[in-house]
Each structure stands twice: as structure tokens, then as C-alpha cells.
């Protein structure tokens, strides 16, 4: 495997070169160590952690989560179909195994368990993704790679993405009592237009912040080079004068799974962030926050399996979808600072959050013109609501000694959650949908549940020796998560019998740990080490989802254990006037992965674990029984390098700089029988090279990027958990590719900034691995033809596209 190690060798070479160019760094007034602020004199890089501040978000023209991680090869975005993305992939795990928090508040869990996807996900009737957030609301994003439940709680198996919202203090002060920022622009890949306003003010101890953003666009374009492929049965080609009928001339053309173009879509997003605060004095402050964000996506699902015929006789429907992602949050916060006392700073916070993930579906018959006013449309609605109420108390204390500093961060918190769903369907008159043509069928597709959690933590940073030569971190956290299925008066006795432990709590509790060591062994070089753990409590659908059906009987399993992870890292870092670099190696071990497991055929013996009663009380015999169970383990290991070199250190023009960011990772899953198998969620190695120039006047700058990504070899994939001996069939379309991007900015005076970027300049056609592994082999959505792979080009990434923004600040 010579190719994957080329970027690593280059990384090592640059690492050796940096110390030669290093010089004294500028003094730093404060140092952040695991989010504990301590006095220091130099800047330390942390293993597995990157902070992206507002200035960088603007520079990178970040408009969504794909832009956020575009040039970070150690993290990728999980594709979630027409409704958007579904979280992130870090170090071989994805979705709910990577924590996502906004101001410390966990975001919605997905409906991504194997059981849910087998039963419902393949048909597109649910918006089962994790919610996303508006980039203009954030002052900083921290990406943590590697298990990190000490800081991020449940879900941080592979890492975490932590967003921090803007505050009035980011813009106003005693010297500047007001701020007004206006921003607008366009995004070429999805014909997006957006506008945003940020206003902040301060008066008599009162301060306020308002961020309002509106976006609208269309479907994300692809780079298909072919027309829509025709798949014909028995060698026949459709002839409109022939009366053979659709069964003889089944043909997929512009619609159906062989469609090569993305489905037509229009979407709109509106987001509001409002903060209000009052400073009683320099030591006491109270604040209030309100967030409201809604995204509506309207899709004409032409690639749906049932929209696949173009013969004269209608055999399918036109399917239209409206997917809604809605989030509302309100909270109150109190801050206190003491010169002498049990804490230097105290923060008390209470938040309430509501997240709705909804899908409306309309099936319109193809022959509606023949039916006229009597035509009917089938309508279904699937609604998932997740409510959260959370309180936290965070404390910080620093003690200074003659040759040491001890900084402690400790606190506790808790909360409760409520998962509810509403599902119904009916027929209505096509030309007047208010007139129902059938009864409204209300059903419960998912078992509703309640949850509670509480936690306490203690995190310490020790600075030892003169000049902060040694730094040691050590922390511990305790979590207890519990959930219970809600009882419903409408449940029959038989249904109650299908839900184990109905109404009683099932709890998961344990400790998370984190330690770190930083040895500054020369003026500019640091040796870094880190150990951390993570856990993920089972999601609601992993625990309580059941499906009593003779062909596929799914049993709920409230006895699941939490998934666990342990992470080790060792690194070398350097910084100076010539730039900075960080080279690290890591290994992570996972265990108790939750997977859908075939238990065998059913039994009518109530004491048998395969006992399978139906809703009417009938016990099934010889039906296949499945259940979510803790089964496999896994390990991943790899190497990462990122660095920036200021080229004026070797005599080139001031402001010229270059950079390299590389990630290489490999790993295996270990099955119950000890066999090791590939992990589909591992991304192929990627290297990002950059070359840029920032004028010393700071009026303008330009940056060029080259991204090289290797192919995902079929031998590094598995077909499914039921077929571990064969590769993922669409992996053969994964090829190595190189992308070239260019971005620039121009400051006009002190108030106005223009930014522009061109992506995929060479108009390269390529598939990302995340896109290929999102294709389904069964169901009705995200499909291609299983035999010929016709329609595969629908999953190509965008070709050449352009972004533009203009921003004015006053």
C-alpha cells in the first residue's frame, strides 16, 4: 500500500522542518486547556481537538455542515437523502455515535438503528435525520475526535461537534455600544440565496443580540454525464401505438430508480437567535436566550421506485414530499464571579428545547387527468417530536502556587426528555384536499417514551515547572441515563404484553475518564499524550421499537447495555513565527455495539426469549424473530497531521503561507465468533494541501486548495451485518479523485468585505464514499437498479460551482 503513506511521509518531513524555522511566539494572555482557562505564556495545541472561530467560518464561506468540514479530512457528513444530512462520521462511527451539542444542549437523536431502517427508513415516510443548525448563529465550533464523554456526555463515542452561539459581548463593549452586520450571498451547488442580519447593543448594563437569517434554494446539483437510462424487459422498447401494456414494456426513464438527475426540490429556512442580558455589576449577570429555526423541503420524488414507469397505462403514483425540521429553544442563565470563595466563576443555566422532524407525503395518481374531479390523493403524515429540559451548574476555580497552577472545573446537571410521535393517513379529493374520501387512520408507528438523565464532573489542569514545562489534565464524570416506555390507555392487554417493562425505568450508569499530558521539552516543541473514554446510551428506537408481524417479528429490548469506547493518542506539536504543526497517532477501541440480530424462529412458549405474540394475543410459531442486541466490538487506528508554514520565514513575501492536513485511518470490527471484518463507516485517506496569500495591508487575500482522496476499496467494505463475506456492491464506483478550489476576499474600507470561491474548478465527476454508502438495496428511496446500477450517477457530487458573499459591519 505505497500510495496512502505518501501524505504521511510528507507530513513527517514537514514536522522535521518546522523546528528549524521556529521562533519565539508572541506572548499569550490566557491559555485554554480542556476548556479550563489558566494563566500561561505560550499556545498549546490539543490532541484530537480543533476550534473553528467566527473569523474562519466567514473565511471558509461556511453555509452548512459540508462547508464546515470541507478541509478537515478526519470528519465527514453522513448523507441523509432528500431531507439533508444525518450527523457526522468520526473515526469509524457515525450518526448518534458522534455527539452534537449547541451551548451544551444535546441535539436530536436520529432514527438510524438497523431495525428502524429495515422497517421504515427505506421507504422515506419519516424524516429520520438529526437536525442541523444555522451557521450564522455561531461564534465558535469545536470538533473533538476520539471518545470524549467527559466533556460531551452520551453519544461521544467517536467524537463530538460542539457549537457555541454568538453573544452580544462578541460585538459590543463600553467603547463600542452598538453593532450592525448585514450579510448576503449565493451558493452555486444548490442555487441558494441567503441574507443575514446581526445586531447588538449595550446600554446601562443591558445588552442584546439579534441574529436573523433566511435561506432558500433548490436541490443540490450533481455531475451526471449521461441521460436517463432506459431499462427494458425482454429486449422490448416501448411503442406508444402498441397495446402490449406495461407488464410487457416495463421501462424506467426520467423517473424511477434509474434516474440520473437529482429529484426537483425547493427549500426555505428561517432562523432567529435572540439574547438579552443584564449586568447588575462586574460580578453578577443574568441572561435570556431564544432560538427558533425551521427548514421546509418540498420534493417531487421522481426517483421513487413506484414512480418508475413511462408506459401509457399508469402503474404508479407521483409522490410529493414535504420534510420539516423545526427547533425551538429558550433558556435563562446566571453568572457570578468571586475574587475569594469556592469558585472564581459560576454559571447556572436552564434550557428547554423542542425538535420536530416531520414528513408529509402525497401520492398523486398518474391518471388523475382521466379521473377528473373524482380523482383522489393519498396523504400520510409522520411526526417525531423530541422535547428536552436541562439544567446545569458549572464552576471554575484556579489556585496559584510558586511553581505550579491548579485549575479546576467542576459541576453537575440533569434533565428530562420526552419522545412523542403522531402518525395518520387518509384519502382526499385531489382538487379539494379538504374533502376526505376515507376515514383518517391514526396509528402509532413508534413506541413513545420518557427519559431522565443526571451527571456530575470534575476536571483538573495542573501546570508544573517553570515556563509551563509540564501540563497534566485529569478528569472524571458520572452519568446516569434512564428511559421508560409510555403507557397509553388505548393499548390492549395484548399490546401491553408486547412491551417489556412497560412504564418502568431502564437505566444506564457509569463513569467517563480523561487524562492528558503536555511536555514542553524544547522552546518550541511539545510531546502530547491523551487517554479518554466515551459511552452512548441506547436511543429510544433501539430500546423500544417493536414490530409484531409474521414475516418480520421485531422484539423490543430494554435490557441493552450502553456502547463504550476507549481512546489513546500520542503526538508531537510545535509552534513559532514560522508556523505550527501537530502530528499524532491514535487508537480507539469500541465494544458492545448495538446491532439488529436474528434470534431464530418464534415459539409459543412464554418463557422462551423468542416468544412472539401478535396484537390480538395470538402467539406465532416458526416466524423469524429479530431484536437489537449488544454484539460486536471494533478497533480503529490512524495518523493525522496538520500544519501551517509561513513562507516569509524563508525569505518569500510576507503573508505567503502553505498548509497540509492529512488523515489516514484503518480498522476492523470483531464479531462474536472472533472474526474481524471491515468497517463501512471508515473514510478513505484524504490529504488537503493549501497555498495562500494575505496582503500585509489586510485588504485582500487569496487561497488555493487541493484535496486528494483515495478510493474506498471493495475489500475494505462489507455487504451487511447479515452478509459479512461480500463487499458493499456500490463500492466499485469509488475512485480516487483530486479537487481544486480557490477562494478570495477583498476588504473595502473598514466596513465592507467581499468573499468569493470556486469549487471543483476542473469540473471533476466523483463520488464521495458517504454518498455511495447511502444507497439502498431495498425499499423505494435512494435506490439504483440493483443489477445494472443504472441511476448511479444521481449520486455524483456537484461539479464546478461558485459561492459569493458580501458583508457590511457598522
UniProtKB/Swiss-Prot annotation:
Coiled coil where?
none
Record's GO cellular component terms: cell outer membrane
| Main subcellular location | membrane
TBDR beta-barrel domain location is: 175-810
Subcellular location per UniProt equals:
Cell outer membrane
InterPro entries cross-referenced by the UniProt entry: Plug_dom, Plug_dom_sf, TonB-dep_rcpt-like, TonB-dep_rcpt_b-brl, TonB_Hb/transfer/lactofer_rcpt, TonB_rcpt_b-brl_sf, TonB_rcpt_CS
Q: Where is this motif: TonB C-terminal box?
A: 793-810
Q: Which family does it belong to?
A: Belongs to the TonB-dependent receptor family.
Q: What is this protein called?
A: Hemoglobin-haptoglobin utilization protein B
Organism whose genome encodes this protein: Neisseria meningitidis serogroup A / serotype 4A (strain DSM 15465 / Z2491)
Taxonomy, top ranks, is: Bacteria, Pseudomonadati, Pseudomonadota, Betaproteobacteria, Neisseriales
Amino acid at each position: 500500500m505505497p500510495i496512502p503513506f505518501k501524505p504521511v511521509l510528507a507530513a513527517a518531513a514537514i514536522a522535521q522542518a518546522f523546528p528549524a524555522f521556529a521562533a519565539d511566539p508572541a506572548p499569550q494572555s490566557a491559555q485554554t486547556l480542556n476548556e479550563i482557562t489558566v494563566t500561561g505564556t505560550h499556545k498549546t495545541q490539543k490532541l484530537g481537538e480543533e476550534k473553528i472561530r467566527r473569523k474562519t467560518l466567514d473565511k471558509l464561506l461556511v453555509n452548512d455542515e459540508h462547508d464546515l468540514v470541507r478541509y478537515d479530512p478526519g470528519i465527514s457528513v453522513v448523507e441523509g437523502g432528500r431531507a439533508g444530512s444525518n450527523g457526522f462520521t468520526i473515526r469509524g462511527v457515525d450518526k448518534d455515535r458522534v455527539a452534537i451539542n449547541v451551548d451544551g444542549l444535546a441535539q436530536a437523536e436520529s432514527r438510524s438503528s438497523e431495525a428502524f431502517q429495515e422497517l421504515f427508513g427505506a421507504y422515506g415516510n419519516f424524516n429520520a435525520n438529526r437536525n442541523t443548525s444555522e451557521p450564522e448563529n455561531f461564534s465558535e465550533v469545536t470538533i473533538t475526535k476520539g471518545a470524549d464523554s467527559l466533556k460531551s456526555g452520551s453519544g461521544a463515542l467517536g467524537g463530538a461537534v460542539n457549537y457555541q452561539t454568538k453573544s452580544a459581548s462578541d460585538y459590543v463593549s463600553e467603547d463600542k455600544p452598538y453593532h450592525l452586520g448585514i450579510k448576503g450571498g449565493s451558493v452555486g451547488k444548490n442555487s441558494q440565496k441567503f441574507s443575514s442580519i446581526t445586531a447588538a447593543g449595550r446600554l446601562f448594563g443591558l445588552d442584546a443580540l439579534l441574529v436573523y437569517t433566511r435561506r432558500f434554494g433548490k436541490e443540490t446539483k450533481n455531475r451526471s454525464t449521461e441521460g436517463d437510462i432506459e431499462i427494458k424487459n425482454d429486449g422490448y422498447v416501448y411503442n406508444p401505438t402498441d397495446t402490449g401494456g406495461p407488464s410487457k414494456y416495463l421501462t424506467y426513464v426520467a423517473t424511477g430508480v434509474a434516474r440520473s438527475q437529482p429529484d426537483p426540490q425547493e427549500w426555505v429556512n428561517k432562523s432567529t437567535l435572540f439574547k438579552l442580558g443584564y449586568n447588575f455589576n462586574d460580578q453578577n449577570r443574568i441572561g435570556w436566550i431564544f432560538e427558533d429555526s425551521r427548514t421546509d423541503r418540498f420534493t417531487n420524488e421522481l426517483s421513487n421506485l413506484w414512480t418508475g414507469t413511462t408506459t401509457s397505462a399508469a402503474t404508479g403514483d407521483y409522490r410529493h414530499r414535504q420534510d420539516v425540521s423545526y427547533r425551538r429553544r429558550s433558556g435563562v442563565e446566571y453568572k457570578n464571579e468571586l475574587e475569594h470563595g469556592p469558585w472564581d466563576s459560576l454559571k447556572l443555566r436552564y434550557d428547554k428545547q423542542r425538535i420536530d422532524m416531520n414528513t408529509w407525503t402525497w401520492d398523486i395518481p398518474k391518471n388523475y387527468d382521466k379521473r377528473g374531479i373524482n380523482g383522489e390523493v393519498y396523504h400520510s403524515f409522520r411526526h417525531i417530536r423530541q422535547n428536552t429540559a436541562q439544567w446545569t451548574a458549572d464552576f471554575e476555580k484556579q489556585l496559584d502556587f510558586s511553581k505550579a497552577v491548579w485549575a479546576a472545573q467542576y459541576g453537575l446537571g440533569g434533565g428530562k426528555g420526552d419522545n412523542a410521535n403522531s402518525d395518520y393517513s387518509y384519502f382526499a379529493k385531489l382538487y379539494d384536499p379538504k374533502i376526505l374520501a376515507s376515514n383518517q387512520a391514526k396509528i402509532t408507528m413508534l413506541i413513545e417514551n420518557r427519559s431522565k438523565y443526571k451527571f456530575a464532573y470534575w476536571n483538573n489542569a495542573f501546570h508544573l515547572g517553570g515556563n509551563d514545562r509540564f501540563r497534566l489534565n485529569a478528569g472524571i464524570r458520572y452519568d446516569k441515563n434512564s428511559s421508560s416506555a409510555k403507557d397509553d390507555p388505548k393499548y390492549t392487554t395484548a399490546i401491553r404484553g408486547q412491551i417489556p417493562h412497560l412504564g418502568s425505568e431502564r437505566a444506564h450508569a457509569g463513569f467517563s475518564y480523561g487524562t492528558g499530558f503536555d511536555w514542553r521539552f524544547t522552546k518550541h516543541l511539545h510531546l502530547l499524550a491523551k487517554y479518554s473514554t466515551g459511552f452512548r446510551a441506547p436511543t429510544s428506537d433501539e430500546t423500544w421499537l417493536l414490530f409484531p408481524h409474521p414475516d418480520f417479528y421485531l422484539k423490543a429490548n430494554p435490557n441493552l447495555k450502553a456502547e463504550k469506547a476507549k481512546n489513546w493518542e500520542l503526538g508531537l506539536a510545535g509552534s513559532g513565527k514560522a508556523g505550527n504543526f501537530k502530528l499524532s497517532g491514535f487508537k480507539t477501541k469500541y465494544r458492545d455495539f448495538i446491532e439488529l440480530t436474528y434470534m431464530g424462529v418464534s415459539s409459543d412458549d412464554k418463557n422462551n426469549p423468542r416468544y412472539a405474540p401478535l396484537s390480538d394475543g395470538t402467539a406465532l410459531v416458526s416466524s423469524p424473530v429479530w431484536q437489537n442486541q449488544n454484539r460486536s466490538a471494533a478497533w480503529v487506528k490512524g495518523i493525522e497531521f496538520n500544519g501551517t508554514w509561513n513562507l516569509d520565514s524563508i525569505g518569500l513575501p510576507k503573508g505567503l503561507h502553505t498548509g497540509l492536513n492529512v488523515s489516514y485511518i484503518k480498522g476492523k470490527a470483531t464479531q462474536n465468533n472472533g472474526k474481524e471484518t471491515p468497517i463501512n463507516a471508515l473514510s478513505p485517506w484524504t490529504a488537503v494541501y493549501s497555498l495562500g496569500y494575505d496582503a500585509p495591508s489586510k485588504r485582500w487575500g487569496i487561497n488555493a486548495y487541493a484535496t486528494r482522496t483515495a478510493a474506498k476499496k471493495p475489500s475494505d467494505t462489507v455487504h451487511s451485518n447479515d452478509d459479512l463475506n461480500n463487499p458493499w456492491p456500490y463500492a466499485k464506483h469509488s475512485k480516487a479523485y483530486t479537487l481544486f478550489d480557490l477562494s478570495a476576499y477583498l476588504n473595502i474600507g473598514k466596513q465592507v468585505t467581499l468573499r468569493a470561491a470556486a469549487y471543483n474548478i476542473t469540473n471533476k465527476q466523483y463520488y464521495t464514499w458517504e454518498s455511495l454508502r447511502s444507497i439502498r438495496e431495498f425499499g423505494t428511496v435512494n435506490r439504483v437498479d440493483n443489477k445494472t446500477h443504472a441511476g448511479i450517477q444521481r449520486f455524483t457530487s456537484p461539479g464546478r460551482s461558485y459561492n459569493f458573499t458580501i458583508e457590511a459591519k457598522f
